[in-house]
């Protein structure tokens, strides 16, 4: 799944781009393309916000006290931003087309098949029925052990009460003797 090299932002391909750099640029996977696309979208949003900021601050030259030099500067900035915005959209389109080309062989799975339904009959539910049964058996065993523990605790409490009563009786007889 190798793709043709994309020129990274701010880097010019010149005499310093050796064969190792070209090889690394050719091996761009789909995840890297998606990251580049995300960064491009962020740049587009940033440029668009700057364009709206310029348009908001820019007044039309209708004879109102407005300097033509300032107007020309802002107009130049606006045209530059629009030119860069069109370049970014072309770059985004290239990234989008390349991602679709790389993922073209994959068959998309409909979302409805990815969502498990309770009343769905099939082998998928049979596979999933194993662990809940095991959990219910384990739960039943825990309940039984708890019942046995409560019974043992009750028996120990009765024995302790009997010993307490015996000690009281012994102490009472010793007290009467003296």
UniProtKB/Swiss-Prot annotation:
Subcellular localization, per the record?
Nucleus
Which Pfam families does the record associate with it? Answer: Med30
Question: GO biological process: any one?
Answer: positive regulation of transcription initiation by RNA polymerase II
Tell me a Gene Ontology molecular-function term this record carries.
nuclear thyroid hormone receptor binding
Function of the molecule? Component of the Mediator complex, a coactivator involved in the regulated transcription of nearly all RNA polymerase II-dependent genes. Mediator functions as a bridge to convey information from gene-specific regulatory proteins to the basal RNA polymerase II transcription machinery. Mediator is recruited to promoters by direct interactions with regulatory proteins and serves as a scaffold for the assembly of a functional preinitiation complex with RNA polymerase II and the general transcription factors.
Q: Could you list this entry's UniProt keywords, alphabetically sorted.
A: Acetylation, Activator, Coiled coil, Nucleus, Transcription, Transcription regulation
Q: What is this protein called?
A: Mediator of RNA polymerase II transcription subunit 30
Residues where N-acetylserine occurs? Answer: 2
Q: Where is the major localization of this protein?
A: nucleus
Cell membrane listed as a keyword: no
Q: Which residues form a coiled coil?
A: 134-173
Report residue spans for region: Disordered.
1-22
**GO CC annotation terms, alphabetical:** core mediator complex; mediator complex; nucleoplasm; nucleus; ubiquitin ligase complex
Assembly = Component of the Mediator complex, which is composed of MED1, MED4, MED6, MED7, MED8, MED9, MED10, MED11, MED12, MED13, MED13L, MED14, MED15, MED16, MED17, MED18, MED19, MED20, MED21, MED22, MED23, MED24, MED25, MED26, MED27, MED29, MED30, MED31, CCNC, CDK8 and CDC2L6/CDK11. The MED12, MED13, CCNC and CDK8 subunits form a distinct module termed the CDK8 module. Mediator containing the CDK8 module is less active than Mediator lacking this module in supporting transcriptional activation.
Family listed: Belongs to the Mediator complex subunit 30 family.
């Amino acid at each position: 799944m190798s793709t043709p090299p994309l020129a990274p932002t701010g880097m010019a391909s010149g005499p310093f781009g050796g064969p190792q750099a070209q090889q690394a640029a050719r091996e761009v996977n789909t995840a890297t393309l998606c990251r580049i696309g995300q960064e491009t979208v962020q740049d587009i949003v940033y440029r668009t916000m700057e364009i709206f900021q310029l348009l908001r601050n820019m007044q039309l030259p209708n004879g109102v006290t407005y300097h033509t030099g300032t107007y020309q500067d802002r107009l130049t900035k606006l045209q530059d931003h629009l030119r860069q915005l069109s370049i970014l959209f072309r770059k985004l389109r290239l990234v989008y087309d390349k991602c679709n080309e790389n993922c073209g062989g994959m068959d998309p799975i409909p979302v409805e098949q990815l969502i498990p339904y309770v009343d769905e009959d099939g082998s998928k539910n049979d596979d999933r029925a194993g662990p809940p049964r095991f959990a219910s058996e384990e739960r039943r065993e825990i309940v039984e052990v708890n019942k046995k523990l409560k019974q043992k605790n009750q028996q120990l409490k009765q024995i302790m009460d009997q010993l307490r009563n015996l000690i009281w009786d012994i102490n009472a007889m010793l007290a009467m003797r003296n």
